[in-house]
């Protein structure tokens, strides 16, 4: 079924705790993940919490990538939402799995904006005139 976008909701477990608490490294790896997925980066913002933890977003022309880390638990919650045919959120997922050194992951893929639910014809172009 065609959809406007794909949304990966990922749980990363047993990650490197030092990586999870390094805001500069997290931002660098999230941007690299966006690049590897084929996305176009618009902007990003990241914040390190005290005493630990990082939250951040990479806004891409095709939607967004977000991360929230809990270094004390070795855990990261990651959303990779991409639109369009040219961006592959699974490439971003694989990059981040390696970068965060996750030993276990759980991921669910959601189709966002399914054509049949919205009433878009299957042969319709991805972007329609407004």
From Swiss-Prot:
The modification Pyruvic acid (Ser) is found at residue 63. Pathway: Amine and polyamine biosynthesis; S-adenosylmethioninamine biosynthesis; S-adenosylmethioninamine from S-adenosyl-L-methionine: step 1/1. It holds the Pfam family AdoMet_dc. The record marks 62-63 as: Cleavage (non-hydrolytic). It catalyses: S-adenosyl-L-methionine + H(+) = S-adenosyl 3-(methylsulfanyl)propylamine + CO2. GO terms for biological process: spermidine biosynthetic process. Its EC number is 4.1.1.50. The active site is at residues 63, 68, 83. Catalyzes the decarboxylation of S-adenosylmethionine to S-adenosylmethioninamine (dcAdoMet), the propylamine donor required for the synthesis of the polyamines spermine and spermidine from the diamine putrescine. This is S-adenosylmethionine decarboxylase proenzyme. It comes from Thermotoga maritima (strain ATCC 43589 / DSM 3109 / JCM 10099 / NBRC 100826 / MSB8). The gene is speH.
